[in-house]
């Protein structure tokens, strides 16, 4: 008994924070791999002789595959568990990132098609990642900590841009665009090995103390999420009537469409923002790598603060509905200020406005906490997949729309209006469509 007590004390009482740190790091690399082409894009387009419209299609290739795999990916997560599916996802997205560094070995006529294919397979492989993050947070964190935890892993996208944009810009400048992809691929392979070793279910984790397990399970964490019973919703497959129930629920539809509009802002920054700075503002690639990190850092700060503020409101006794909606509405109002960049030629002011807009986007990007709060507990992964289908339609639409606008109008002005209006539409979804935020119950 004494030995048992000693062993128990050696275990972590905050193992969930270690899990969150790992998710944060993996998500940062996830977004860096998405953004590799935007940083190297000017040089890639020049060497492979690609037009703005062609680049728009290549940027959107990720989104086509990412969207197509969302519902199958969510079902795979519910059936096989987060650890196993995420392991394969991480390995293969790292592989296809690595291989993008070799597309110049193809004849020029095929190089653009090869890049499109690699980006398509990158999206295919990354598809389960965010639904898996939502499942892991739902399994490991009590309700009152879930907003902060979700905001932290979601803010990894901004931290990623802040950390990797200067690095990838320097690699492009000093070593060539090919090394942007090969270096990121190798980082992903290392993370795959660490993931296998460090990630476990709450009830199986060797560092998990009985005290922490009791605390999280009694306060809303779904600790047995991956302990599936025969005949459960996950075990029996992605039934069409489950998806129909999600799509006929007004609250869920408001959340789904809101995520589409929020993601439009994200995909502008992930694809065209560095090219905007080069073509519209005349910056060098090396300078763009540094400048792009400023809005990203502000987005990171906004992302963390939005989650903390939301959970603070819950702890003060405010309703879950108000605590989630207020940061979203305020954040989207700030994000819409991106339109003001059309009214100044001052580069410093443009960067400041972009930073304010990205801070607002981060502050209001609480879609994943809302999904953790509202998804039917039997199909959290599937619900996250449907949510991500809606959200990542933006990964297809945004690059293409901006590519055509820039090609036809020879300016980014209309593109910034498109992005700013999307922020306002996200606000409308949460104010007038979502209604009360509560967990949806499946009709069996």
Curated annotation (Swiss-Prot):
GO terms for biological process: D-glucarate metabolic process; galactarate metabolic process; monoatomic anion transmembrane transport. Induction: Induced in the presence of D-galactarate, D-glucarate or D-glycerate. It is a multi-pass membrane protein. Keywords: Cell inner membrane, Cell membrane, Membrane, Transmembrane, Transmembrane helix, Transport. InterPro entries: MFS (IPR011701), MFS_dom (IPR020846), MFS_Na/Anion_cotransporter (IPR050382), MFS_trans_sf (IPR036259), Sugar_P_transporter (IPR000849). It catalyses: galactarate(in) + H(+)(in) = galactarate(out) + H(+)(out); D-glucarate(in) + H(+)(in) = D-glucarate(out) + H(+)(out); (R)-glycerate(in) + H(+)(in) = (R)-glycerate(out) + H(+)(out). The keyword Signal does not apply. Gene3D superfamilies: MFS general substrate transporter like domains (1.20.1250.20). Probably involved in the uptake of galactarate and/or D-glucarate. May also transport D-glycerate. Belongs to the major facilitator superfamily. Phthalate permease family. This is Probable galactarate/D-glucarate transporter GarP. It comes from Escherichia coli (strain K12).
């Amino acid at each position: 008994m004494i030995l048992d007590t000693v062993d128990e004390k050696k275990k972590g009482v905050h193992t969930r924070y270690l899990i969150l740190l790992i998710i944060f790091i993996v998500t940062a690399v996830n977004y860096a791999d998405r953004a590799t082409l935007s940083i190297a894009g000017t040089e890639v387009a020049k060497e492979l002789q690609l037009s703005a419209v062609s680049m728009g299609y290549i940027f959107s290739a990720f989104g086509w595959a990412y969207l197509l795999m969302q519902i199958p990916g969510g079902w795979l997560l519910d059936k096989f568990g987060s650890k196993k599916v995420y392991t394969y996802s991480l390995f293969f997205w790292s592989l296809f990132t690595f291989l993008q560094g070799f597309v110049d070995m193809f004849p020029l006529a095929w190089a653009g098609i090869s890049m499109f294919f690699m980006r398509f397979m990158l999206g295919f492989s990354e598809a389960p990642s965010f639904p898996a993050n939502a499942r892991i947070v739902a399994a490991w964190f009590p309700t009152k900590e879930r907003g902060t935890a979700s905001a932290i892993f979601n803010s990894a996208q901004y931290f990623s841009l802040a950390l990797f944009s200067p690095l990838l810009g320097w690699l492009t400048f000093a070593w060539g665009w090919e090394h942007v992809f090969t270096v990121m691929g190798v980082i992903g392979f290392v993370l795959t090995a660490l993931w296998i070793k460090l990630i476990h279910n709450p009830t199986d984790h060797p560092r998990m103390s009985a005290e922490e397990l009791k605390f999280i399970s009694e306060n809303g964490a779904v600790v047995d999420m991956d302990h599936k019973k025969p005949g459960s919703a996950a075990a029996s497959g992605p039934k069409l009537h489950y998806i129909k129930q999600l799509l006929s629920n007004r609250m869920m539809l408001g959340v789904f469409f809101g995520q589409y509009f929020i993601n439009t802002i994200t995909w502008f920054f992930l694809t065209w923002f560095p090219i905007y700075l080069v073509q519209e503002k005349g910056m060098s690639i090396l300078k763009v790598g540094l400048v792009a990190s400023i809005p990203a850092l502000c987005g990171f700060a906004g992302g963390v603060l939005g989650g903390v503020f939301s959970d603070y409101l819950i702890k003060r006794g405010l309703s879950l509905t108000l605590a989630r909606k207020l940061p979203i509405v305020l954040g989207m109002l700030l994000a819409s200020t991106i339109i003001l960049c059309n009214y100044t030629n001052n580069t410093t002011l443009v960067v400041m406005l972009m930073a304010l807009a990205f801070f607002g986007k981060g502050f209001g990007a609480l879609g994943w906490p809302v999904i953790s709060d509202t998804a039917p507990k039997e199909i959290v992964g599937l619900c996250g997949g449907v949510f991500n289908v809606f959200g990542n339609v933006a990964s297809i639409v945004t690059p293409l729309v901006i590519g055509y606008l820039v090609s036809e109008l020879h300016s980014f002005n209309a593109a910034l209006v498109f992005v700013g209006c999307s922020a306002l539409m996200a606000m409308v979804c949460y104010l007038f469509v979502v209604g009360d935020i509560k967990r949806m119950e499946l009709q069996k």
